[in-house]
Amino acid sequence: MTRGPIFLNVGISYGLPRTKLPAAVSFRKWVAATLQGRIRKADLAIRIVDEKEGRALNYHYRNKDYATNVLSFPAQLPEPFPKALKIPLLGDIVMCAPVIAREATEQGKSLSAHYAHLTVHGTLHLLGWNHEDHQEADAMEQLEREILANLGISDPYLGEY
């Protein structure tokens, strides 16, 4: 098993006041737990947005006219990218704070646990995981459960059917 990451750069930016948002160190911990044993170097950005920005991004990139909880944008480096200059850029994660807060309340979850789950979920998308069909969804959800359990966070899918 690969130990790591040995290099982790997670940039956090906020498109709204930081009230009731997890600290940057929490996001870094959740990303590191997701990458543990999978990748040793990573550079990614997380942006926390309001509903207006979240809706605009979801519409622009997915043609869906509503704000969603998390969007992931894997890095697309031009080919061929010189090996000597190659950076371990995974991509960007956008999280919509009002949607996440609303979901946490509706689902009876702590806000921190819900952010942790969606950070893990978004990071897995950057690593190539998807949930386009039941088999992919089951595999991704199981991995999310394992990562969150290692963080001391209970199964986010309990009670769903």
UniProtKB/Swiss-Prot annotation:
Its cofactor is Zn(2+). Keywords: Cytoplasm, Endonuclease, Hydrolase, Metal-binding, Nuclease, Ribosome biogenesis, rRNA processing, Zinc. Its EC number is 3.1.-.-. GO terms for molecular function: metalloendopeptidase activity; RNA endonuclease activity; zinc ion binding. One of its GO terms (biological process) is rRNA processing. Gene3D superfamilies: Metalloproteases ('zincins'), catalytic domain. The keyword Cytoplasm applies. It is found in: Cytoplasm. The keyword Amino-acid biosynthesis does not apply. PROSITE patterns: UPF0054 (PS01306). It holds the Pfam family YbeY. Zn(2+) binds at H121, H125, H131. Binds 1 zinc ion. It comes from the Bacteria. Its main location: cytoplasm. GO terms for cellular component: cytoplasm. InterPro entries: MetalPrtase_cat_dom_sf_prd, YbeY, YbeY_CS. Belongs to the endoribonuclease YbeY family. Single strand-specific metallo-endoribonuclease involved in late-stage 70S ribosome quality control and in maturation of the 3' terminus of the 16S rRNA. HAMAP family: Endoribonucl_YbeY. This is Endoribonuclease YbeY. It comes from Xylella fastidiosa (strain Temecula1 / ATCC 700964). The gene is ybeY.
